[in-house]
Amino acid sequence: DPRGVADSTPIECLTDRQLDRFLNVDPNPETDEDVAATVAVSKRFGPRCKTNSPDLAPNIGTPFVARDLDILRSLVGDEKLNYLGKSYGTFIGATYAELFPSRVGKLVLDGAVDPALTNAEVSKGQAIGFEKALLRFTEWCAGEKDCPTGDDPQAGVQKIADLLADVETNPLPADTGRPLTAAQAT
């Protein structure tokens, strides 16, 4: 795992209570107050990482991960890195190629994230893609026996939206002890 996540030394940014607040921010801010709350929660995230993981936080980021890959490449004795990256991994691969162009072997970047795009542009593109994928799913499901979203794809999309709206109001219990909210389900 890249430094700072999962089975590497994880960066500690938020307490459980703060993480709950962060994860449960309204996924569809509709009012100025909703947007302000989302921005406020998001702005507190980064500084808390620096406060709670002062030794690790300054060494987290894509260029560090790319450099770690180069160390691994060297340790296994390869002259060039052969790499398969998906989603964010495509950004890691592109960064590696930029930092170490003479050490690039074969790169497969599947579902490439354009490093020139802003986070807002990436998010917008993903939202459009997810919307298309959801409609395609309900179209496929409509042709199957006992499709839970029904035989009308648009109505199926609405059925899913209604379920998420219900979960926003009435979170579902989960084995983790944290309820499943609409923010976490989307």
What do these predicted regions represent?
Residues 2-183:
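Gly/Pro-rich cap/lid or specificity-loop segments adjacent to the active site
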Residues 186:
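Extracytoplasmic ligand-binding site segments that recognize negatively charged/polar headgroups
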